[in-house]
Amino acid sequence: MDQLTIERQAPVIAQYDAVVCGGGPAGWVAAVSAARNGCRTALIEKMSYLGGTPTAGLVDPISGGYHKGKRVLGGVGWEFVERLVAAGAGQVELPKGHVSFDPEYYKLLAQRMVLEAGVELYTNTVVSACQMADGRVTHVLIESKDGLQALAAGTVIDATGDGLVCRRAGVPMQVSAGGMQPMSLCFLLRNVDVTTALLRDHIHHTGLHGQSKHMGIYHALQKLAEQGEDVPQFGGPWFNSTMQEDLICVNITRAAANAADRAQLTQAECRMREDAYKLVALLRKLYPEFAKASIAEIAAQGGVRETYHIRGLYTLSGADILGGAPCADGVAFCSHPVDIHSAQDNTQTAQYFDTPCPVPYRVMVAAGFDNLIAAG
């Protein structure tokens, strides 16, 4: 392969105490927290809006805010939920504490909270590289319509979802021994009758506490496949509220790919876009509730479950998660079960734990890098 050597200059346009790369849930919340604690903070996001997986990926609901009826979600995240609910754009369904939300209002509220905190927001901007010196990230290089620029950084938070900044900095990465979990491409479906027994216990905005994953539809699709019908690979399916009566969010497509690989990601998203229409056509044939259904919107990006993991100062083990032992540097609690989706078929496993799992700060700090933290 031919190689090009390119020399470019990047003006240093600003200096920040904290530069957060990625405006998904982990990123924008980290930026708000940093700014509220007195840091001059920049938030870099490739899309024109914030939210990441919940908005660009249409992954709904926000899962696991409660554990056995007790709230474990706190801080900026819970403040966000309270403001969603107050605006009529979200609903907390007990006892699990799943939060149904309006994806468009999510974008607006995240933006409001970021700007209210004094964060300097860089949308439509990508992180291209970082500059290192003595084991520290000194500058983050960004590209936008303004060209290549640099931000001087005291601390860098990598909330890109696939460790992009960490990989650029040379942090050792690892992948799961069993391979990466598959991704999904969610979509919004209009003209679905959610008032009958088929769906009403699976849609969060009804206020009922039914399981979101629809085993009845799962088995019906499996049966069609066994009969020789052309059924694309699927997961779930899950049907969730958007807080709008005429739109539901559907999580059903599935593709095994490394989402940190451009070619694999392109192929997977193209295939899942085709699969979404095939699966909706099958649902129209199977159930009168879907007879008039049509796709209103397909997510702008795939819902990625897994890519790379950093090697931090500490690695959270299965025993840590299932044991729920307290730790001195815990910064958050996880109450969602450990669910592993198979890349080979449409199955998944889930492990539930007795007590919420504390997430230690040590797992997010890149080993050997003083000022680089991975979140999300």
Question: Which role does the model predict for each range below?
Answer:
Residues 1-18:
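Extreme N-terminal leader/targeting segments of oxidoreductases
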Residues 17, 138, 154:
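Conserved acidic residues
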Residues 5, 9, 53, 143, ...:
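Flavin (FAD/FMN)-binding glycine-rich loop and adjacent Rossmann-like elements that form
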Residues 7, 15, 33, 39-40, ...:
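Conserved N-terminal/central alpha/beta ligand/cofactor-binding core
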Residues 134-140:
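Short, hydrophobic/aromatic-rich segments at coil-to-beta transitions
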Residues 22-25:
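Glycine-rich Rossmann-fold phosphate-binding loop(s) that bind the pyrophosphate
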